[in-house]
Amino acid sequence: LIVSSPKPIRRRLGGAILILLATAGIAPAAAADLRAPSAGADWYTGAPAQTVDDSWAIAVDGSTSVTSNSSAFGSITVTAPVAGSPTQSGPRVRVEAIAGTYSYPGQAVASRVTGYQEEGSVMAGYEWVWRDAALAGFIGFNARSNQLSIVDPGNPVVGTGVGLRVAANFYANPTDRTMVSAYGSYSTKFNAYYSRVRLGYMVADGVYIGPEALFLGDDFFRQYRIGAHLSGVKFGPVQMSLAAGFVQDRVQGSGYYSSIEARANF
């Protein structure tokens, strides 16, 4: 199993992105009296920045996701500009860590198997920031470890190795009250992939609600999730996102999922 995801951003006086999903982002800079993109689109939570703020240098995103199909994952992502302001187009670096556990009925061993996954990645990329949209792309390497409670000949996703990893995130405000965000990543290690698309309508100042769809998998499992999200809820300097919905897994069958994501800028 893999949970990594994705981040978007919008601003009252403008729109932007930082990414997660990430669980990555993009962010632009502009005068406070102009309609410009915000300082750090959160591709992970979809939470929008309300004002232009160039004082922060890095964005930290955290997420946790659980399913009724016996899986639980958490991740933390740090994104920072290589030079210049994070609210302007420019090169970026991203470091991500993921850990989780899962269990499934082992067909080849006639017993329930529990798996443990740890993963870390380092990537470099570039982020383009426009008035009401942002796009970022990254490339780098990831190290991933998957261990099983018992040997399962039917599961090829086991062991530790390094792979090439690419990721991209997009965020836009098509209108003053709508948002769209997308995140995707792929690693050559176990052919792991993750993608998420969110649409949102602003129901309060900077708060969006709408549908989301996720597709994720690797050489062993394939899964999709359809649900709804509430993004942009703020608690002081922290922006939050909540989501829940239906999950369909090739190995585990159908079930439900929920996720909580947060972002803070430093």
Predicted regions located by residue number:
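Outer-membrane beta-barrel proteins and related beta-barrel translocases across Gram-negative bacteria
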Residues: 32-69, 77-83, 116, 141-142, ...
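Short loop/turn motifs that connect adjacent beta-strands in outer-membrane beta-barrel proteins
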Residues: 45-57, 81-92, 129-136, 173-179, ...
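Intrinsically disordered, low-complexity segments enriched in Gly and acidic/Ser/Thr residues
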Residues: 192-227, 234
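Transmembrane beta-barrel architecture of outer-membrane proteins
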Residues: 57, 71-75, 117-121, 161-165, ...
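Short, exposed beta-strand-loop hairpins at the edges of beta-sheets
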Residues: 247-251
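Outer-membrane pore/translocation modules
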Residues: 89-192, 213-215, 244-246, 259, ...
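Cleavable N-terminal export/targeting peptides
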Residues: 1-55, 266
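Outer-membrane beta-barrel "beta-signal"
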Residues: 32-36, 75-76, 228-233, 253-266
